């Protein structure tokens, strides 16, 4: 458009003018600045719009990004809304950000529209921060479960002393076998050294008492006529 023209040019994509000029630029010098950028949470993907459209659920638009269009200063970020990233969702329209999944849950898809898209981590996994796109497998010696003391998927929990979990992503702990012990959070059980046996709950090794010796992980009385050496 040139000065003195009787016609108006349409506002570019990502901008709007308002109802007074029906989406066109003003007829005076400086008309290019009369088209405004869409506000946060809105966009325009057509020219000549009097208003901007709301971002749909699952999407957002924070601010307009600088760019260029047909030789004019443009607003590329206002031409479309962005998908909420993995680990996030948006259940409202015309929003300028997304809502994060809570600790212990995850969401592995973009543009999600409901809080129900955030799913609890499976057993043997946890999500220790908000907005998680995936869950982390519990390390050996730790676990999570469906119910009970280890069901909080916000973190993985140590197997109690006397138990162990060998692999990653464990959902249960196994009790130490005969003659073996473990501390809390251990991936395997260990044998007691000679002359010592496991205590009753397999959490520590204890010395055989005076007059007894260890044989096959059991403290036994020394036979009459024999000495402990």
Report each predicted region and the residues it spans:
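Disulfide-rich, cysteine-dense extracellular ectodomains and adjacent flexible linkers of secreted
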Residues: 1-229
């Amino acid at each position: 458009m040139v000065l003195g023209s009787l016609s108006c040019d349409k506002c570019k994509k990502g901008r709007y003018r308002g109802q007074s000029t029906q989406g066109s630029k003003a007829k005076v010098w400086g008309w290019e600045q009369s088209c405004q950028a869409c506000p946060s949470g809105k966009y325009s993907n057509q020219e000549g719009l009097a208003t901007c459209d709301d971002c749909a659920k699952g999407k957002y638009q924070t601010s307009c990004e600088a760019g260029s269009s047909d030789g004019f200063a443009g607003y590329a970020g206002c031409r479309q809304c962005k998908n909420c990233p993995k680990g996030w969702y948006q259940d409202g329209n015309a929003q300028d950000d997304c809502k994060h999944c809570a600790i212990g849950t995850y969401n592995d898809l973009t543009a999600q529209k409901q809080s129900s898209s955030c799913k609890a981590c499976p057993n043997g996994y946890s999500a220790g921060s908000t907005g998680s796109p995936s869950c982390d497998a519990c390390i050996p010696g730790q676990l999570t479960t469906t119910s009970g003391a280890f069901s909080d998927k916000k973190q993985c929990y140590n197997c109690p002393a006397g138990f162990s979990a060998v692999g990653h992503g464990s959902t249960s702990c196994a009790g130490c076998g005969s003659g073996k012990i473990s501390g809390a959070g251990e991936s395997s059980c260990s044998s007691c050294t000679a002359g010592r046996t496991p205590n009753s709950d397999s959490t520590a090794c204890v010395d055989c008492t005076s007059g007894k010796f260890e044989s096959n992980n059991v403290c036994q009385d020394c036979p009459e006529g024999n000495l402990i050496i």
